A protein has these predicted regions:
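Nucleotide phosphate-binding/pyrophosphate-handling subdomain across enzymes
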Residues: 1, 11, 73-202
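Acidic, Mg2+-coordinating active-site environments of NTP-dependent enzymes
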Residues: 1-83, 97, 101-115, 120-124
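Flexible, gly/pro- and Lys/Arg-enriched active-site loops
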Residues: 2-4, 130-133, 140, 204-223, ...
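Short amphipathic alpha-helical segments
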Residues: 5-6, 40-42, 164-166, 191-194, ...
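Short, surface-exposed connector motifs at secondary-structure boundaries
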Residues: 18-27, 172-177, 199-202, 246
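Beta-strand->loop->alpha-helix junctions that form or flank phosphate-binding loops
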Residues: 29-33, 45-65, 86-91, 126-136, ...
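A glycine-rich beta-strand to alpha-helix segment
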Residues: 238-267
């Protein structure tokens, strides 16, 4: 939405920063580009809201890829939560988990001061955190729908997010994929196709049935002008059937409506 928000990271951050209203006890900043962090910090200080920053106040360390997801430690202040595992793929998932835990620990610390809530830093609490994290299910977020054949589903709608997808594929030793792209024309479908072409044996374009989003075969024509060959399909089901006819691993990238349709199809099957 660059028309409404601006065409630079700093301009977009300036708009988004107004969620900091001065009423918050604390705000938490994920890993950011320097110009974005500068805007967010300036807003927090102007509104006199305390803030915590990834890499300074909390962070994920010792991040490893496994066949079951990500394994890592989370450091919050002087405390370390070791050997946490989440059934999601991508280094960013570990970093997002660190941010979420930092928020939760502060909320729990407040509760501990006000009640008889168990010590949040006890070994019992750490084990409970591990159990809950290992049971996370987050549809369409680097979700492995199948391991044989390999099918990865992610709600990626811009080229920047493709780097996370490609990083996962590199760590898993996967290449020459059939890539299904279901991204509306007002989003970065072209950037996603450009980014994924070097790991794609073929790129299949598709559309969701949600009338709120606009898809058309002009996407295929536009990419062809850049020398990127694609196959157009009129539905998610058609795209999946076409992908299934090939022996290659499958990566499905798309907007939330496309993700929902894929999930429904796999649930039925």
């Amino acid at each position: 939405h660059t028309r409404e928000l601006g065409d630079t990271l700093a301009a977009i951050a300036e708009d988004k920063s107004h969620v900091i209203t001065g009423e918050q006890k604390c705000v938490y900043f994920a890993e950011q580009e320097p110009e974005v962090l500068e805007v967010l910090v300036r807003r927090a200080e102007a509104m006199q809201v305390p803030y915590k920053i990834y890499g300074r106040d909390f962070q994920a360390e010792n991040i490893h890829y496994t066949c079951s997801g990500m394994l890592f430690d989370v450091v919050i202040g002087d405390n370390t939560y070791p050997d946490l595992q989440i059934p999601l793929l991508g280094e960013h998932q570990a970093k997002n988990c660190a941010l979420a835990l930092a928020v939760c620990m502060d909320v729990m610390a407040d509760l501990c001061r006000k009640s008889d809530t168990p010590d949040i830093f006890s070994e019992t609490m750490c084990n409970q955190i591990r159990r809950q994290l290992s049971a996370i299910h987050h549809p369409g977020r680097m979700e492995i729908l199948s391991s044989d054949p390999f099918i990865l589903l992610d709600a990626c709608i811009h080229s920047a997010s493709c780097e996370n997808v490609k990083d996962v594929l590199r760590h898993l030793g996967i290449q020459n994929c059939t890539v299904i792209v279901g991204i509306p024309e007002d989003k970065d479908y072209a950037g996603v196709a450009r980014s994924m072409k070097d790991v794609a044996a073929r790129i299949i374009l598709t559309r969701s049935g949600n009338p709120h989003y606009h898809f058309s075969q002009k996407q295929q024509e536009s990419l062809a002008e850049e020398g990127i060959g694609t196959i157009w399909t009129d539905s998610v089901k058609q795209a999946l059937n076409l992908a299934d006819s090939c022996p290659d691993p499958i990566v499905i990238l798309g907007t939330t409506s496309v993700i929902s349709e894929v999930e429904r199809i796999f649930q039925r099957s």
